[in-house]
Amino acid sequence: MRFLRRLGSPALLALGLGLGLACGDEAPRTTRGPVPGGDPERGRQVITESACGVCHTIPGVRGARGLVGPPLTKFGRRSFIAGHLPNTPDNLVLWVLHPQQIDPRTAMPSLRLDEGQARDVAAYLYQLD
């Protein structure tokens, strides 16, 4: 208690404001930029051919109204991929390539895509805003 008294009111106010800002509900979200080497149109085709819409709702993909996985709308504005990976292009490519290795409890199957296809998928998902 003596320590708090020595800090004084201005220091306590600054500390409280800093903690309040750090504990906010959402981190600032920004739309991710283009994925190096990724083509959004090819990504849409890969998503269609891989039947991602069986599990996910995906704007712009015919019949993609799945309810098993999360909807992939506004993907670039999300802070995390699969609830725990920071949402970066490289992390998304890794997730698309190896979901079971990253999270053994995930329901997402291995799609057996190559890195170029995963980059294309990431490019498509990041332009969904």
Give the residues covered by each predicted segment.
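Electrostatic cytochrome c docking/interface patches
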Residues: 24-48
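C-terminal motif of bacterial Sec signal peptides marking the signal peptidase cleavage site
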Residues: 19-22
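Short acidic/polar alpha-helix capping motifs at helix-coil junctions
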Residues: 57-58, 70
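Bacterial N-terminal signal peptides that target proteins for export
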Residues: 1-12
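Cys/His-rich metal-chelating microdomains
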Residues: 26, 58-59
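Extracytoplasmic electron-transfer domains, predominantly the class I c-type cytochrome c fold
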Residues: 37, 45, 63-129
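Short cysteine clusters
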Residues: 52-55
